[in-house]
């Protein structure tokens, strides 16, 4: 299998993830439970999309940095730092735009500092620098240490208590950044600072899988390696959840293992479908691949555009008008909400498809 084919299957998984992120982020009103995040302990399908993206980023880090032989040259480090800063800045821009569009253009008193792109930025920067300066044979031991340290923080610091006054994760964020710069819809900011510890372990597991994909010679060997790692992570996450429950809000160690395992298994299945049995594809499956490939090759651009577009359409009242039009046809609220979310996914697909046809791939 060529490098291009290998990346194609990864692009498909990235596209599935980004389309999923847009879908679950843009329901309207009352939604199906599976399209919403777990309130605290537990996990829904919605809770898979962000961790899948971090896992994919880990694989991409390895496949990207291997081109420079992991040499810590000035140009490579400069590119990592630049990308980290830009990702963080774009995340802040989205949060600022949500306030600015309602008139608070120069008011930063309530600007949320941490969100999805900010966490992606920190994890990308840390893991990329790790890849340049640390022996890769220590990747799994590093993951174990990070998860063990984070587990100790959760257990000793009341991390599973949904009360900001005692939860160590909430307290650190409150003391460092203040309540006005944090997420207000839960006791703990789901992208808070300490949660970055387990998120880095998450990306490192993806990095390790990227190493396996690169080092195995045949497609069959790559698939088997991913299946083994995926199965071990799922089993480990399940067993660990008895003492440390699955929890997306605090990015618990069991949640890391479970979601990384599921992502590895899905990547293995996609490699089977795309790289082993591609000759057996039908017109429908080819169209499906193209649909997700559109999202996969411009993942960052389409995620950012979807966030900005959702804010803009909400401000202009377009979102409400479209939803009301849908609701007149589809009476049940949950189904109307799903229909609106699907409409919004297709709207962003249209933007992505224009870029795709013109071979415009926006990268940082």
Which stretches of residues belong to each language-model region?
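Alpha-helical transmembrane segments and their immediate juxtamembrane cytosolic regions
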Residues: 1-364
